[in-house]
Curated annotation (Swiss-Prot):
UniProt-recorded name of the protein: Protein TIC 214
Organism (species): Vitis vinifera
Biological process annotations from GO: protein transport
PANTHER family in the record: PROTEIN TIC 214 (PTHR33163:SF40), PROTEIN TIC 214-RELATED (PTHR33163)
Acidic residues biased stretches: 298-309
Function: Involved in protein precursor import into chloroplasts. May be part of an intermediate translocation complex acting as a protein-conducting channel at the inner envelope.
Biased composition (Basic and acidic residues): 249-258, 268-287
Signal peptide (from-to): none
InterPro entries: TIC214 (IPR008896)
Region (Disordered): 249-317
Length: 1893
């Protein structure tokens, strides 16, 4: 067996070697290149097909030979550089190929031009065979150069870079290509033979009908092929930019290019070499540059190697002394292109060229021809234009390579470097040419490598010896300060020993020490200057125009004499405006280009202006305060290649006054929505979707409207070739985005996969599913919202299509606009007045008073507002600009609706709520109809005759009622005056005539007047109408539901669907059956067969029955009926309750609202006749009380006394008791019952007496709902809204609710154990209460012995109790359960354990203890549950509302006190998170430690107070800082102490040390309400923590009035913090005294801008747009009051978005609308110094062993002073668990050395110099014993050796100073990456063991 496997393995490896060999790969690639068919194949195929005879054979041979020779030359040119250069020169082949194509075309079409006249058959004399050979050869060569071939032909070139044996690969690939072509030619020959021999083709009708077709085809074949060739060439040439007809770009102002021409570094030289070459065409096109430039560059022809730069000032020559030398540049060409160097050119390489003014103004014909025709650096290739972030920079050239290859020494070996400085390589080449070859000796590779190894080993040994000496001195007891290597610093004064400041010390900071306008790293900023370092500096825009910020800017002033006169002109012009308006520079009349004259640079105003530019003291124009200069460090960045011109998109034209645009962006139209006619008004609008067009007289606010068509332009630069773009398609007529066909499978489903597989399966298994179907409650809310969404999408698409059709058809907008205006005038002045006249004439004819005034008032109220094409309102008279071209809409405000009569304005509350959403506007269509949205479907207009018909029906009904009264009087008279002889026929006629009208109404009226008069009649009528009555009750239930939904339309926005009706129909079938059974029983008992005859005879039979039956029979019948009903009622009700209520609770997030709340209560009435007496009968309290879903808890005695089975009858929970408890409930929770209490109809479950008693204040109570902050969600059903009102549900995680699936819910939630704590005796009153709705069996008595019996039960179910006990806290002082509409809540309710285990909270992991500790002895089922539901242990980000204010100290994050042990009982403080949506308490174990620190640690390294903004939609990406923590937390939930994520303490740390015996509240002066609660919690007694119950916070919503007071406290705190009165800030530095509130706001806001990015809330975008639309109209109206009120009522305008104050501050703005600004932190890479990065790494990765085991041995609190080093060492000390001595430094012995030598030492020992193969590959983790010789003897370290080894590994892994940014810097310099992926290429090695050699 072993032998077989061995042989098999050898065989596989052999096969792999063969497959991967160069020969096989070459053959494969060569064979693939066979299929790269290009134009050269046309000649080959023509020779094969057309040539016959002897000459034809020779031509075939010559064609094949030429073809193969050409391909062989191409393969050889890959390997042989001279041939590649000859064929690959940019313009050689192109220039030669074009004339050859022309010659070939004429040769084939006009052969007599070239015919010698000889008819000899000598083929040598005839040039045709040679021409065939040349054609095939040359076209094979051209195929790769002038005619782009397919990708297959380039595969060989690609693989060449990977292959070592290149010649073998080229040979094998050519052989493969040859084999492929031989097969191809054979196949073509076989096909031709088959065509010739196949009789069916030859006998074709077409061929037979034309005898000469074949011969003519053969004769013209040459011409056909030449035409094909020409078409092919034209097509291929079309994909190459036309050399002459390309778009010429205009160059930007030269001042913007000074940054590129001024650079000196090698990297910059490389960049500038790539950015040149674009100016020739500009100089050609503009012939002469009209603007004298400050700096300009002179370029030579691009086919020369050397490109030098020069600087010109006003045409005067600068001397070498005035300028530094400019290093020469090298064109981005291969290194081996040295054969073109001319020796004379090298003399100019290091010279500054003399000024040559004529070169600047060369005419186009003076340029070289090749340069004129071909400039490969143009925007000809369809590249994307990447816009610069700031306007002062130009676009990045992303197609140029940033690499330059050259050989260099690296690690002692000569390697190819791909980022070698080009200037250095040229310099080396020049030096080598100048020096004779005899003087240069080249060392061998081995000698170089050995020398390099030797020197490095010497350095390493020296360092190692010094290092070990220092360590030994430390072990011998020397002072640490003596052992540590000192850092060299500069002194100011040697006698006083004062050092230079850290900022200016070159030994600390490197060579560049100017105060550069960047951010400093906090590690080298003194504590006092930290406040200044975060000042936001706004760059003056004029300064940015003049001086690009590409290079370092120092504080010393520039030499002003070196300025060009351009700046002089510029300053002179600006000077005029500074005199006119010193605060605002009005640049409208400013020209940057002077025409004549010079400026006296010594003028006083100009000097001021120069000071303004060069000193850069920016003043605030409002209060003239001078902002401080900020300090920072220049970031190291590579200069990227940029274009020499800046392109403009067409939407930017308005901003920058550019008349042209060079980028073809998406089609858009500027829609001007507001015009300000004030001259020279200074308007600036900072809204994102506004564009400002500053014309000379008007300021216009415009919106950009994009068409909905696909964007085929795709930001292509004008002049670039569209054919080279990736192909894009659309599938629909109007599709917003085009897609490439490559990705269609990801976007659209293929047609053959479009059918729904799940739907098919449903159809197949439908019958089987019906059999096994249980009663399920479909989620109608979600279905309905989904249907609505889809319907809205469909309508939106239809509207867009119509709009686009109007927008694309020629002259359609003109026609539509005229039609709309015509319809508007026709409607307003013809149709509506004529309708008013006709109506009032009709009223007068019908003797009604006319309503002229009311109708005319409504008619005058209708306004026809002209709108833009998108619906932005302008005014009634003002038309949009270019409305005939861009389109117009006409919006009708308060559209006139003709009414038959006008009602008075008194309306009830319910009707008002129903009409809330009626829109009072519409848009006019072309056909004169009304529509809600532009291009929407026409809406129904209210009918004029409908109210008339309704009124007629009412009148008829009244008339019937009068007839009923007449009939009643007649009947009474017949009984009283029976002696009157009324004829029988007369009575019959009266009764018949009235009964004929409506027999039902008669019976009801008679029953109301005298129930006993026609009692028999009623019974008879009941027999035939009972079923109908029952149906009407059921239907009444449905109507009741839908009416409730309509009434509460503003918060439940859906109605009953047909699906729900079908669902309910099944459920009512059983009711109907039982009702029919009751009816049949009644018929048998009380009715005789002859009774049931006809409605006419029913009255006589009823009389006969009444006379026969006695009263006791009637009572007996009634009792029997009730008894029968009760039996069915109880049986059915128990069944329904068991199924329906439980399923509703199981599927809480999906439960249908009306079904649970109403229908379960109305099921009672489905059996009860609509009769109040029956309800009273049911409501009698003589039956047993039930306990409904754990709301009413039984006492112990009641449990022990009850032994009978308890029926869960809902009716025994009397309504009086329910309403009594509701009256005790807080007002805030009563709006759940609004629909019940405010229902005006007959309530099917609520007694009128109770409702009238309780509903006395229903309207007043529910008026509170209007003030409730949390608006209801339109998609929620009533059950969810009912739960939303309970704060237990509101703040429960969806993860928890998802646990409530049927079986688990039954086992875990309802079978919870409840322990009642009465009189603090925990061991006496423990009991287990089972849910009554699940188990109906007897309840046992769990009294004193329940502790022992239920031990495992407690353990098993305890954590599920916490679901409703710990985490869910009501806002009053007591607990209430999860199902708890708070009818009854127990006080002092606790959960006790049989032994005092730490109380497990829901957030188990947040205390740093893994879940496994809990699962050891608990049930295994729960472990499986956690495995199946991994989200159980993860933190739910969407529930908590973060309250970022002041930040806690860093130690609070690390040193989380873990008060959890199996032998100690601990309690929990409740810290409060206050949000705008309400309050809830989150239980956490947390101790704030006393600390003497002055500064707060803010959590992510930000020493700022963060604004208290609630984040409702909190996603992990929202806070970039959280992403790292969130991902780490997902992998290891125990790693991060999450308390800092949950709780952010709002006070100063100093007050926490007041937890002394006196328990006084000192603290901060500005502690808000929740901070005071924190103080209360901190000051509570420790004994009080022994109780595991809820801590009484004593301040709930009632104490604080409402939520507004809480929010006002927040705002007060924000204001106080903004005003600079924060005590923490005052302790560190004195705050600046601001002159006014605005400046303080602005100052702190600008500081905050460094830390946060502002963005608009997504949900508010549409609101803002709607507001803009309304504002545009209101600004134009003289009296906008009515329109404004109407817009607010319609919801078009949000008052909270209108800034109404003049001097609006940030705080007030945030008060006005909470949620407009979402302030989210951005990455603070600039401020992250070494300590912070160190802490981040350790805080995530270091896990103290107490995080894994609940052990209190190492629990201690450290008090840390203010120094960074001590702070860090103490922090690490805490993690190690060392309490006495600080041995932190010994963990990393390298810390003895200075940082610079430390890095050197580290790199040297990292290199395993002797055993290297290319790259060092050391093990990822080193041996754990690497540092043990220093650490084994230490007895004070952590006792856990394994933990220490892990710690050492981590410490050795990091840089000793944790300066991870060093890696980024090394990476940047070594690998020259500038794309942000700093760590993408570097390999970090672990440090090997220290060795002594």
């Amino acid at each position: 067996m072993i032998l077989k496997s061995f042989l098999l393995g050898n065989l596989v490896s052999l096969c792999m070697k063969i497959i991967n060999s160069v020969v096989v790969v070459g053959l494969y690639y060569g064979f693939l290149t066979t299929f790269s068919i290009g134009p050269s194949y046309l000649f080959l195929l023509r020779a094969q097909v057309m040539e016959e005879g002897e000459e034809g054979t020779e031509k075939k041979v010559s064609a094949i030979t030429g073809f193969i020779t050409g391909q062989l030359m191409m393969f050889i040119s890959i390997y042989y550089a001279p041939l590649h250069l000859a064929l690959g020169r940019p313009h050689t082949i192109t220039v030669l190929a074009l004339p050859y194509l022309l010659f070939h075309f004429f040769w084939n079409n006009h052969k007599h031009f070239f015919d010698y006249g000889s008819t000899t058959r000598n083929s040598m004399r005839n040039l045709s065979i040679q021409c065939v050979f040349l054609n095939n050869l040359i076209f094979q060569l051209l195929n790769h150069f002038i005619l782009p071939s397919s990708m297959l032909a380039r595969l060989v070139n690609i693989y060449m870079f990977r292959c070592n044996n290149k010649m073998l690969f080229v040979t094998s690939s050519f052989v493969g290509w040859l084999i492929g072509h031989i097969l191809f030619m054979k196949w073509v020959g076989l096909v031709l033979v088959w065509i010739r021999q196949n009789p069916s083709i030859r006998s074709n009708v077409l061929i037979r009908s034309n005898k000469y077709l074949v011969s003519e085809l053969r004769n013209s074949m040459a011409r056909i092929f030449s035409i094909l060739l020409f078409i092919t060439c034209v097509y291929y040439l079309g994909r190459i930019p036309s050399p002459i007809l390309t778009k010429k770009m205009k160059e930007t102002s030269e001042t913007e290019e000074r940054g590129e021409s001024e650079e000196e570094t090698d990297v910059e030289i490389e960049r500038t070499s790539e950015t040149k070459g674009t100016k020739q065409e500009q100089e050609r096109s503009t012939e002469e540059d009209p603007s004298p430039s400050l700096f300009s560059e002179e370029k030579e022809d691009p086919d020369k190697i050397d490109e030098t730069e020069e600087i010109r000032v006003n045409g005067k020559e600068k001397t070498k002394d005035e300028f530094h030398f400019k290093e020469t540049c090298y064109k981005n060409s291969p290194v081996y292109e040295t054969s073109y160097l001319d020796g004379n050119q090298e003399n100019s390489k290091l010279e500054i060229l003399k000024e040559d003014e004529d070169n600047k103004n060369k005419k186009w014909f003076e340029k070289p021809l090749v340069t004129l025709l071909f400039d490969y650096k143009r925007w000809n290739r369809p590249l994307r234009y990447i816009k610069a972030r700031f306007q002062i920079k130009k676009a990045v050239r992303n197609e140029m390579s940033q690499y330059f290859f050259y050989t260099c020494l690296s690690d002692g070996k000569q390697r190819i470097s791909f980022t070698y400085p080009p200037s250095l390589s040229i310099f080396l080449e020049m030096i080598q040419r100048k020096m004779s070859l005899s003087t240069t000796e080249r060392l061998s590779y081995d000698e170089l490598y050995n020398h390099w190894i030797y020197t490095n080993e010497q350095k390493e040994n020296t360092l190692r010896k010094e290092f070990i000496t220092r360590i030994e001195a430390l072990d011998n007891g020397s002072l640490t300060l003596d052992v540590l290597e000192k850092r060299t610093r500069l002194c100011n004064d040697a006698t006083k020993k004062e050092y230079l400041p850290k900022i200016y010390d070159p030994f600390l900071n490197g060579p560049y020490r100017g105060t550069i306008k960047k951010m400093f790293s906090p590690s080298i900023i003194n504590e006092t200057s930290r406040e200044n370092s975060i000042e936001k500096f706004r760059i003056n825009k004029i300064y940015g125009i003049l001086f690009a910020i590409d290079y370092r800017e120092f504080e010393h002033t520039f030499d002003r004499k070196s300025l060009s006169t351009k700046i002089g002109y510029f300053l002179n012009l600006i000077n005029q405006f500074t005199i006119e308006s010193p605060s605002n520079l009005n640049l409208k009349r400013l020209s940057l280009f002077p025409e004549q004259g010079k400026v006296d640079s010594d003028s006083e105003d100009q000097a001021k202006f120069l000071n303004f530019f060069f000193d850069r003291v920016i003043t605030d124009p409002k209060d003239q305060t001078i902002r401080k200069k900020s300090i920072g460090i220049k970031e190291i960045s590579k200069k990227v290649p940029r274009w020499s011109y800046k392109l403009m998109k067409n939407e930017e034209e308005g901003e920058t006054l550019v008349v042209y645009q060079e980028i073809r962006s998406r089609k858009s139209k500027h829609v001007v929505i507001f015009t300000d006619n004030q001259q020279n008004a200074d308007t600036y609008t900072a809204n994102a979707n506004k564009d400002i067009d500053n014309s000379e007289q008007t300021n216009e606010v415009a919106l950009i409207r994009y068409s909905q068509q696909s964007d085929f332009r795709r930001d292509i630069i004008k002049g670039s070739m569209r054919a080279q773009r990736r192909k894009i398609v659309i599938r629909e007529l109007f599709q917003a985005n085009v897609h490439s066909p490559l990705f269609l499978d990801r976007i659209y489903k293929p047609i053959f996969f479009s059918f729904d597989i799940s739907g098919l399966i449903k159809l197949i298994f439908e019958n089987w599913k019906e059999k096994n179907k249980k009663l399920k409650i479909p989620n109608y809310a979600e279905e309905k919202t989904r249907e609505k969404r889809q319907k809205a999408k469909r309508e939106e698409k239809a509207r867009i299509k119509i709009a686009e059709v109007w927008d694309t058809v020629l002259f359609a907008q003109v026609i539509r606009g005229c039609l709309l205006l015509t319809q508007s005038i026709f409607r307003k002045y013809i149709i509506l007045p004529s309708l008013i006249i006709a109506k009032n004439i009709g009223r007068m004819l019908l003797f009604q008073s006319p309503e002229w005034s009311e109708d005319l008032k409504d008619w005058n109220r209708e306004m026809h507002v002209k709108c833009t094409y998108n619906g932005v309102q302008l005014s009634e008279t003002e038309f949009p600009q270019n409305w005939l071209r861009d389109g117009i809409q006409i919006k009708i405000l308060f559209p006139f609706c003709l009414k038959p009569w006008h009602k008075p304005q008194e309306r009830s509350l319910d009707k008002d709520s129903m009409k809330d959403k009626v829109k009072k506007f519409c848009f006019l269509t072309v056909w004169g109809m009304e529509t809600d949205l532009p291009f929407g479907s026409p809406r129904k207009r209210p009918s004029f005759f409908k109210p008339i018909l309704k009124e007629l029906e009412k009148r008829i009904r009244k008339f019937k009622n009068k007839c009923f009264l007449v009939l009643t009087v007649l009947k009474e008279r017949t009984k009283l005056f029976i002696f009157l002889r009324v004829s029988k026929e007369t009575k019959k006629w009266v009764i018949k005539s009235v009964l004929f009208i409506n027999i039902k109404k008669i019976i009801k009226e008679l029953l109301k007047i005298n129930p006993t008069l026609l009692f028999g009649l009623r019974e008879v009528y009941e027999s035939s109408e009972t079923q109908k009555q029952k149906d009407s009750i059921i239907n009444n239930q449905m109507i009741h539901k839908s009416s409730i939904q309509i009434r509460s339309m503003n918060w439940t926005n859906y109605s009953l669907t047909e699906k729900k009706v079908k669902d309910l129909t099944d459920r009512t079938s059983t009711i109907r059956k039982k009702i029919e059974k009751i009816i049949k029983d009644k018929k048998k008992l009380f009715l005789t067969p002859e009774i049931n005859i006809s409605p006419n005879k029913a009255s006589y039979n009823a009389k006969r029955l009444e006379s026969q039956k006695s009263i006791w029979q009637i009572l007996k019948r009634r009792n029997s009926r009730l008894i029968r009903k009760l039996h069915y009622f109880i049986k059915f009700f128990i069944e329904r309750i068991y199924i329906d209520i439980l399923l509703c609770l199981i599927n809480i997030p999906r439960t249908n609202a009306q079904f649970f709340i109403e229908s379960t209560k109305k099921i009672i009435d489905k059996y009860v006749y609509n009769n109040e007496r029956n309800q009273k009968r049911i409501g009698k309290p003589n039956q047993k009380k039930i306990h409904f879903i754990s709301i009413i808890k039984r006492s112990v005695s009641s449990i022990s006394n009850k032994s009978s089975q308890i029926f869960c009858d809902l009716s025994s929970l009397s309504q009086a008791y329910v309403f009594y408890k509701l009256s005790q409930t807080q007002v805030i929770n009563l709006y759940k019952l609004r629909s019940v209490l405010q229902y005006n109809g007959t309530s099917l479950f609520l007694k009128n007496e109770r409702k009238d008693y309780f509903g006395f204040g229903a309207h007043e109570i529910f008026h509170y709902e209007l003030r409730h902050k949390k608006l209801r969600n339109s998609g929620m059903n009533q059950w969810k809204n009912w739960l939303r009102g309970h704060y237990q549900y509101k703040y429960l995680s969806p993860i928890i609710w998802s646990r409530l699936v049927p079986q688990k819910w039954r086992n875990r939630v309802n079978q919870h154990c409840v322990a009642q704590n009465q009189n603090k005796d925990l061991s006496k009153w423990d009991l287990s209460q089972k849910d009554q709705l699940i188990h109906y069996n007897k309840q046992n008595d769990y009294e004193a012995d329940s502790l022992t019996n239920q031990k495992e039960n407690f353990k098993k179910h305890y954590r599920y109790d916490l679901l409703s006990y710990k985490y869910i806290n009501y806002e009053d002082k007591n607990d209430s359960y999860i199902y708890g509409s708070p009818l009854q809540v127990n006080n002092n309710q606790d959960i006790s354990y049989n032994y005092n285990t730490h109380k497990r909270k829901f957030f188990d992991m947040l205390e740093g203890i893994p879940i496994n500790n809990y699962l050891g002895e608990d049930d295994i089922m729960y472990i499986e549950y956690i495995k199946k539901n991994p989200d159980r242990k993860y933190f739910d980000w969407k529930i908590l509302h973060f309250c970022f204010r002041k930040k806690v100290d860093i130690e609070v994050w690390i040193n989380t006190s873990i008060n959890s042990n199996k032998n100690t009982k601990t309690g929990s403080n409740n810290y409060q998170i206050i949000d705008k949506k309400g309050l809830f308490y989150l239980t956490q174990d947390q101790e704030i430690k006393p600390s003497n620190q002055k500064d707060l640690f803010d959590w992510m390294g930000m020493n700022e107070e963060i604004l208290n903004r609630s984040i409702s939609n909190l996603e992990p990406w929202f806070f970039p800082e959280f992403v790292l923590l969130y991902n780490t937390y997902k992998m290891k939930p125990w790693v991060i102490p999450i308390k800092l994520l949950l709780l952010n303490f709002n006070g100063n740390k100093n007050y926490s040390k007041n937890r002394n015996s006196n328990r006084k509240q000192k603290g901060n002066l500005f502690i808000s309400s929740n901070e005071k609660k924190l103080l209360k919690l901190e000051n509570r007694n420790q004994e009080e923590k022994e109780s595991a119950g809820q801590v009484d916070l004593g301040s709930d919503v009632q104490n604080q009035g409402n939520l507004e007071s809480v929010l006002s406290n927040h705002e007060k705190d924000i204001e106080e913090d903004y005003a600079g009165s924060d005590s923490d800030m005052q302790k560190r530095t004195k705050k600046k005294q601001f002159k006014n509130h605005t400046e303080a706001e602005l100052d702190l806001f600008l500081k905050r801008y460094l830390l946060f990015q502002l963005r608009w809330d997504d949900s508010l975008n549409q609101k803002m747009i709607n507001n803009i639309k309304v504002y545009c109209l209101l600004l134009r109206l003289i009296n906008p009051r009515e329109i404004c009120i109407s817009a607010i009522q319609r919801g078009e305008m949000s008052l909270d978005l209108i800034p109404v104050h003049k001097d609006l501050t940030l705080t007030e703005l945030m008060k006005m609308k909470r949620g407009i600004f979402i302030i989210e932190p951005i990455r603070l890479s600039v401020k992250n110094d070494g300590q912070f990065i160190m802490y981040q790494t350790i805080g995530i990765s270091l896990v103290h062993k107490s995080k894994y085991q609940t052990n209190q041995r190492y629990r201690e609190e450290r008090y840390v002073d203010n120094k960074n080093c001590d702070k860090f060492s103490a922090r690490c000390q805490k993690m190690i668990g060392n309490k006495d001595k600080n041995h932190y430094d010994l963990l990393v012995p390298e810390n003895i050395l200075s940082p610079r030598r430390r890095r050197k030492f580290r790199i040297l020992i990292c290199f395993n110099l002797r055993n290297r193969s290319g790259v060092a590959r050391n093990p990822v983790f080193c041996n754990g014993n690497s540092c043990n010789k220093f650490l084994d003897e230490n007895k004070h370290l952590d006792r856990d050796k394994n933990q220490l080894i892990k710690l050492k590994k981590l410490k050795l892994f990091l840089w000793p100073n944790y300066r991870l940014e060093d890696l980024a810097c090394m990476n940047r310099y070594w690998f020259d990456t500038n794309n942000g992926s700093c760590f993408s290429m570097i390999r970090i090695h672990m440090y090997p063991r220290l060795k002594i050699r």
